[in-house]
Amino acid sequence: MADFSGLKAIYFNGTLEKAPGKSHTDLLIDVSRKIMEKHGVETEVIRVIDSGIATGLWPDMTEHGWETDTWPEIYERVKAADIVVVCGPIWLGDNSSETKKLIERLYSVGHDLNDKGQYMFMNKVGGCLITGNEDGVKHCAMDILYSLQHLSFTIPPTADAGWLGEIGPGPSYGDELPDGTRAGFDSDFTNRNTTFMTWNLMHMAKLLKDSGGLPAVGNSRKDWDGGARFDFENPEYR
C-alpha cells in the first residue's frame, strides 16, 4: 500500500453556523478526515464563517476597504496543502454564501504562478462534500468541481460525496432519530462515496507529488507570456 505520510489536506466548511454552533457538514468531514489521518495525512478544518476571510475578489481585501482579512495567511496554508476539500450545506438548492465566498477568494489568487510558471493550484487535488435536505447535491458538486478545475486543481474520479434528507422539514445529517440512531450514518451510498472520494484524493495527490507534478510543457503561463506557443497555430495564418 502507498505511503501517504507527508501529504497535507485542508477541509473548508461553508456552514452558516458560527462555532460552537452545530455543523452537520462537520460530521461528514470527520468521516473523510479519519480515513486520511489513519494513513498519515495531516489534516485541518477551516470553518469559513469563523475564519475572518473577507468578502471580495482581491488577494488582500484590506487594500480595498476591509479593516481585516485573514485570507492572505490562509492562502499560504492552501499553497502548502496537497488536497483541498470544499464542503458545505445546501440552501435553496445551492451552495451556501460562505462556500461561494471561499471559491471567490480562491479565484482572487488564480493568476498566481508556481515555481514552474504554472498556475498555483496546478498540482493540487480538489474534492467536495455536501449535506442538506431535499435536493441539490449534484448541482452543488457540479459548481464546486467546475470552479476548482477552472482554477487548475486536479479532480480525480468520484471527487464528490454527500447526503440528502427527505423532502420537507426533517432531520439533517447526524441528527438523533426517535430510535436513537443518527440520520444518514447508515447510508451506504454516502459512506461508499465519501470513502471512495477520500481514497481517490489521496491516490491522486500521491501520484502528483511523487512524480513532481504535471510537466510544465504546454501549460506554463510564464512561458506563454514569454512567447512560447507549444505548437499552437493561429488559424488566421493556416
Language-model features, listed with the residues they occupy:
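N-terminal beta1-alpha1-beta2 submodule of the flavodoxin-like/Rossmannoid cofactor-binding fold
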Residues: M1-K116, G180, G184-R238
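Short, glycine-/small-residue-rich phosphate/pyrophosphate-handling segment
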Residues: S23, D115-G170, F189-R192
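Short alpha-helix boundary/capping motifs
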Residues: H64, T154, S172, E176-L177, ...
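Intrinsically disordered, low-complexity segments enriched in small/polar residues
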Residues: D160, G168, P178, W224-D225
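Short helix/strand-capping connector loops at secondary-structure junctions
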Residues: E166-G184
